[in-house]
Each structure stands twice: as C-alpha cells, then as structure tokens.
Amino acid sequence: MQYFSPEQQYNAWIVSDLVKQIFHKRAGCSPGIHELAVFAEEHFHIDIDFVFSIIMNIGDIEFALTDEIEKKLSGYLSTLLPYVTADMFETSKANAHAFLSRRHGNAAYHLFVSDDAFMRKQ
C-alpha cells in the first residue's frame, strides 16, 4: 500500500539528506539516527521521524491530509534554505531521484518549494 506519494517521498528525502549534509558540515562526521533527530529538532524544528516515515512509506493516510504533509515538507525545505548551497541541494535531489527511481521508475518529481528559491541565494 502506498501511504505517501512518490513526490512526498522525494521532498522528504531531500529534507533528510540536507539535514545530514548540514550536520556533517558542522560536526565533521556522519550522524547516528538519534543524533540526527536531536540535531534536526533543536536547530530546525524538523521532526525527522515524520520525514523518515514518509521516505519509508510507513504511516496511515488518514493521519494527515495531503495538503498538510506537503505544507509541512515545504516549511522544512524553506527552513533549511539559509544553510544550503547549490551543490548540497543538487546532491540531495540526485540522491532522492536515485532512491525513488528504483521504486517508481524515472518519473519527474517537483519540489514543494521552487528550485528558484534555492538558486537565488547562490
């Protein structure tokens, strides 16, 4: 059963990957799951468990409406914007696409915020 859309999974993957990259950049090492969850919550108010549940398609579709999920992911992406470089963003998009292409083929996915929002800051 598909609880979350591939596009929601794509955006969640990017959020997760960007948080990992920011953590690595600041700490100089890769985080464990607990460290990542604490870092995401303390620094960005991101519920990484929620993000992981979308990526892994674990959940109950009745729990949240599509618009609520997309709004939350959009907010997370916007929160990360000041801390992300174009290279970090492109790496995360490529990683997300590679992950999803194994499950859903080579579909095109859209961000819940515009690519331009990330590119303008460069």
UniProtKB/Swiss-Prot annotation:
Domain of life of the organism encoding this protein: Bacteria
Name assigned to this protein: Uncharacterized protein YfmB
